[in-house]
C-alpha cells in the first residue's frame, strides 16, 4: 500500500507499506530500489549488494509474492501492498535443508552469492520445479554469478537437497578453506544464509556513505542519496 502524509493539504511524504518476512513494514519512498530500502532503511543484511543497479549478479534476489526477483532493479514503489520474502523469512525447514545441503557439498566459500541463490531455488521449489534436473538448476543459476565456488557443487546440493546429509566437521572445513585461500574462512550454515560477516554488513549505526565526485567526496546517509547528490 502507498500512503501519503499531508500537512496543511500539501503532500510532503510518501510511505510504502508491504509485508517483509511475515511482518508489515512502512518505508519512506525516496525513489530508490527495494534493495536500498531493505539494507539502508530496514537493516536486512542477508540481501547482498553485488552490482546494483545493474541487476546482473543475482546476489540481491528475494521472493516477491513468491516469485524470484532482483531487488536492486525493483523500484520500492512496486512492492506496495505486496509480500517480500528474503532468505531470513524462509521456513526453518527450508533454511536447514538448503544450508545443510550446501555445507555438505562444499557449495559455498565466501557465501556472498548464496542467499540469493537459495531464495531463487526455494521460489522454484515452491512452484513445483524439479531441481533434480540439471537443466532446471542451470536455468535458475543463469541469473546468478559466483566468483569462487563454481557451479558443480551447487548443482549437487540442489539435486540432493531432500537427502539427510551426515554431519560435516565444520572446523576442519574452515581450516582447509583458510589454507587454500590464504585468508581466514568460516564454513557453516550461517554463511550460506548470508551471515558471513562482510564489512558492509557490520557498519556502525548512523554511518555516512561516501561517493567519489570529481576530485572530492560526497557523503550522505544512504548509498542512493550519496549517488544522487554526486550527480
Language model: regions and residue ranges:
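A basic, amphipathic helix-loop patch mediating RNA/tRNA/ribosome contacts
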Residues: 29-64
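Cofactor-binding beta-sheet edge motifs in enzyme active sites
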Residues: 11-19, 24-29, 44-45, 144, ...
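Short, Lys/Arg-enriched N-terminal segments with co-localized hydrophobic residues
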Residues: 2-12
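Solvent-exposed alpha-helices and their adjacent loops that cap or buttress functional pockets
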Residues: 54, 102-105, 140, 184, ...
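Glycine-centered loop/turn positions within well-structured domains
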Residues: 25, 58, 70, 108, ...
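Glycine-rich phosphate/adenylate-binding loop and adjacent beta-alpha elements
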Residues: 62, 67-78
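Ferredoxin-type iron-sulfur electron-transfer modules in oxidoreductases and energy-metabolism complexes
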Residues: 31-45, 73-177
Amino acid at each position: 500500500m502507498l500512503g501519503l502524509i499531508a500537512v496543511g493539504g500539501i503532500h510532503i511524504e510518501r510511505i510504502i507499506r508491504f509485508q517483509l518476512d511475515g511482518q508489515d513494514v512502512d518505508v519512506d519512498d525516496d525513489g530508490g530500489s527495494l534493495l536500498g530500502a531493505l539494507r539502508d532503511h530496514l537493516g536486512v543484511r542477508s540481501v547482498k549488494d553485488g552490482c546494483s543497479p545493474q541487476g546482473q549478479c543475482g546476489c540481491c534476489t528475494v521472493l516477491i509474492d513468491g516469485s524470484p526477483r532482483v531487488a536492486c532493479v525493483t523500484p520500492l514503489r512496486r512492492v506496495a501492498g505486496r509480500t517480500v520474502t528474503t532468505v531470513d523469512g524462509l521456513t526453518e525447514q527450508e533454511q536447514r535443508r538448503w544450508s545443510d545441503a550446501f555445507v555438505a557439498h562444499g557449495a559455498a566459500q565466501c557465501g556472498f552469492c548464496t542467499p540469493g541463490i537459495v531464495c531463487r531455488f526455494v521460489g522454484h521449489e515452491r512452484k513445483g520445479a524439479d531441481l533434480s534436473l540439471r537443466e532446471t538448476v542451470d536455468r535458475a543459476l543463469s541469473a546468478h554469478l559466483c566468483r569462487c565456488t563454481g557451479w558443480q557443487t551447487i548443482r549437487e546440493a540442489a539435486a540432493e537437497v531432500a537427502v539427510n546429509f551426515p554431519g560435516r566437521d565444520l572446523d576442519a572445513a574452515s581450516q582447509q578453506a583458510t589454507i587454500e585461500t590464504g585468508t581466514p574462512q568460516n564454513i557453516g550454515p550461517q554463511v550460506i544464509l548470508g551471515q558471513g560477516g562482510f564489512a558492509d554488513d557490520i557498519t556502525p549505526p548512523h554511518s555516512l556513505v561516501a561517493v567519489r565526485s570529481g576530485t572530492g567526496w560526497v557523503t550522505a546517509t544512504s548509498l542512493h542519496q550519496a549517488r544522487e547528490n554526486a550527480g
